[in-house]
């Protein structure tokens, strides 16, 4: 079955569209990536999304308009794929997160992804699954990370302890025990590790007055020196001490957090390059800190994916926190495209919801009280 996954993350850099051929049943799947593209938001729309995600108030009327505008951009991404592949049978659309609140004590969490699935289905003529996180949250889960079950299916190793570390705007990890070990499936865990690219990207945007949006290959940060005392200070923040299940987003690690980091850096008179190096070090150190706190077994391989996997300086800094017996590489090196891995995941989640009708979440990862079917199904007109 030809399934198209659509994903736009907290960085709001583009809509990732990945067309995959899925064969097999339930969790015994084979995946072939046929096409992957990045479809960019118009800059004005992107800025609006970022402002809303950072807490700018807007009317319900404007929210409804924004929901539709985002859906139409997702439709454009689908149509680009359809120009070459007319046999797309199913769409899994994550949508665009503009708000995420983890559960707290007895209070359920809440999440809001814009980009109406019914519009995508009707305008493309393809059944569409969206709103994947809500069902997990409704039974007490974090609604994230949702990729862990897919990581287990596609990236587990018979003998190696692996961590699949996504480096999108926010970082998240899936720990995969060796498949040959007893009850390995029940020992899979995952959580959000903290900032991935988000603080680095926001800082680059600030320092270049909007001319650049990311640090290409980490070349700018690599010219500086990270300030270890400042990193240690930042790691005392409450989220880094919180035990999994846990999730986060721009609500915590956004513009306001960057401003506080900037003010902290002024105390030490850091240069721009040292500031970027220190933010990069925070991402690397928070990952290492997280593993050391919450994982019992030594890790054989760390598999990086997402936009940050291209940041060579970040990759180097992550490796520096682990012994030489732990290999840091990208998922590309084990056969999984690192740029489109998240989009591929939502194609699979849609397949599980629409075709296999099996749960997509792992309760031990999200904290949900039970496994649930994830996503709302939207059928096109006249179907």
UniProtKB/Swiss-Prot annotation:
Keyword Kinase on entry: yes
NCBIfam families, alphabetized: PRK09585.1-3, PRK09585.2-2, PRK09585.3-2
Name of the gene: anmK
Keyword field: ATP-binding, Carbohydrate metabolism, Kinase, Nucleotide-binding, Transferase
Function statement: Catalyzes the specific phosphorylation of 1,6-anhydro-N-acetylmuramic acid (anhMurNAc) with the simultaneous cleavage of the 1,6-anhydro ring, generating MurNAc-6-P. Is required for the utilization of anhMurNAc either imported from the medium or derived from its own cell wall murein, and thus plays a role in cell wall recycling.
Name under which the protein is recorded: Anhydro-N-acetylmuramic acid kinase
One GO BP annotation of this record: amino sugar metabolic process
Tree of life domain: Bacteria
Biochemical pathway: Amino-sugar metabolism; 1,6-anhydro-N-acetylmuramate degradation; Cell wall biogenesis; peptidoglycan recycling
EC category: transferase
Residues annotated to bind ATP: 9-16
Entry-linked PANTHER family: ANHYDRO-N-ACETYLMURAMIC ACID KINASE
E.C. number(s) listed in UniProt: 2.7.1.170
GO terms for MF: ATP binding; kinase activity; phosphotransferase activity, alcohol group as acceptor
Record-linked HAMAP family: AnhMurNAc_kinase
CDD domains attached to this UniProt entry: ASKHA_NBD_ANMK (cd24050)
Reactions catalysed according to its record: 1,6-anhydro-N-acetyl-beta-muramate + ATP + H2O = N-acetyl-D-muramate 6-phosphate + ADP + H(+)
Organism for this UniProt entry: Crocosphaera subtropica (strain ATCC 51142 / BH68)
Similarity-based family: Belongs to the anhydro-N-acetylmuramic acid kinase family.
